[in-house]
Amino acid sequence: MTNIRKTHPLLKIINNSFVDLPTPSSLSSWWNFGSLLGVCLAVQIMTGLFLAMHYTSDTTTAFNSVTHICRDVNYGWLLRYLHANGASMFFICLYLHVGRGLYYGSYTYLETWNIGIILLFAVMATAFMGYVLPWGQMSFWGATVITNLLSAIPYIGTELVQWIWGGFSVDKATLTRFFAFHFLLPFIISALVMVHLLFLHETGSNNPTGIPSNSDMIPFHPYYTIKDILGFLIMLTTLSLLVLFSPDLLGDPDNYIPANPLNTPPHIKPEWYFLFAYAILRSIPNKLGGVLALVLSILILAIIPMLHTSKQRSMMFRPTSQFLFWLLVADLLTLTWIGGQPVEYPYIMIGQVASILYFLTILILMPLISTMENQMLKW
């Protein structure tokens, strides 16, 4: 008798995706982050669901409802901090996952890559709207500053901003709709994840060498299920340590002050995972230029497949390209640091240099070095 997992209509899909899936035998730990992102999404949806049961999306009670969750709800503090720090873990895994794709040339799977970019935007939008919900000072002013950027769009900018706000400033209508979208988007993300996996399983996984591995495949289970479980344990341990020992390490103390439209905080800044993009935005003196640079800093990922000039897929055997890749990583870390600093000398200048270097590395230096490597190998 054939095993039920191979014949049952529903189990067959799961089997072909997670059990009998032919997988390259050489995958390193860098391939763990996809499954870790799945765990992050599950944790966020579960904790978020329970938080939503006690949260009220009204400007007069939102801040107090979060306080109530932390003080009066059984393990409410745990739910709240798991959700807040879970978002940080989500973005750490997300950036490492994208970085892996860049390093090993996974972007040549165009459909998978493009759905991944849409997912990145969706997760960023969800996180931004979630940060507004506690209705602290940074929630309110962060929402005001970021939504106000849309007013830089010619002709329709002002109307667009007021349409999003649902009034003439960030207020009750804004908070209510942000809560609605923050609740809805994770389920849309879940659907997109399935499409992402669907496209990935059409082509099969890439591997560290970048060379087709059709002749050397192993089943996903038990080899990679065990490997993924180790990843889960490491990530969940890290998250637990963060939540239980320093839950506010990555947050902003200003968000413990209730939102006050009459009092602007000295330094308005988003959560740490958006600081690199915020630094790029601030480094351009023109409002519209800054907004375009902000969007392009992420959207640039979409044109990376077109900029691939190397005859090799992966950077594994390309030391010069590796140097540029790590230069880009260092540049992004510099931008993250700058995004959290006040707008004054020398931070403005460092931010401008780092922003130029970011676009220069991706658009010009990487394709140029790849072509040079081809020449050196007489290809």
UniProtKB/Swiss-Prot annotation:
It is found in: Mitochondrion inner membrane. Binds 2 heme b groups non-covalently. PROSITE patterns: CYTB_CTER, CYTB_NTER. InterPro entries: Cyt_b/b6_C, Cyt_b/b6_C_sf, Cyt_b/b6_N, Cytb/b6-like_sf, Cytochrome_b, Cytochrome_b_C_euk/bac, Cytochrome_b_N_euk/bac, Di-haem_cyt_TM. A ubiquinone binds at residue 201. GO terms for cellular component: mitochondrial inner membrane; respiratory chain complex III. Heme b b562 binds at residues 83, 182. Pfam families: Cytochrom_B_C, Cytochrome_B. Its cofactor is heme b. Gene3D superfamilies: Cytochrome Bc1 Complex, Chain C. It is a multi-pass membrane protein. Heme b b566 binds at residues 97, 196. One of its GO terms (molecular function) is ubiquinol-cytochrome-c reductase activity. Keywords: Electron transport, Heme, Iron, Membrane, Metal-binding, Mitochondrion, Mitochondrion inner membrane, Respiratory chain, Transmembrane, Transmembrane helix, Transport, Ubiquinone. One of its GO terms (biological process) is mitochondrial electron transport, ubiquinol to cytochrome c. The chain crosses the membrane at residues 33-53, 77-98, 113-133, 178-198, 226-246, 288-308, 320-340, 347-367. The keyword Metal-binding applies. Component of the ubiquinol-cytochrome c reductase complex (complex III or cytochrome b-c1 complex) that is part of the mitochondrial respiratory chain. The b-c1 complex mediates electron transfer from ubiquinol to cytochrome c. Contributes to the generation of a proton gradient across the mitochondrial membrane that is then used for ATP synthesis. Belongs to the cytochrome b family. Heme 1 (or BL or b562) is low-potential and absorbs at about 562 nm, and heme 2 (or BH or b566) is high-potential and absorbs at about 566 nm. The cytochrome bc1 complex contains 11 subunits: 3 respiratory subunits (MT-CYB, CYC1 and UQCRFS1), 2 core proteins (UQCRC1 and UQCRC2) and 6 low-molecular weight proteins (UQCRH/QCR6, UQCRB/QCR7, UQCRQ/QCR8, UQCR10/QCR9, UQCR11/QCR10 and a cleavage product of UQCRFS1). This cytochrome bc1 complex then forms a dimer. This is Cytochrome b. It comes from Macrotus waterhousii (Waterhouse's leaf-nosed bat). The gene is MT-CYB.
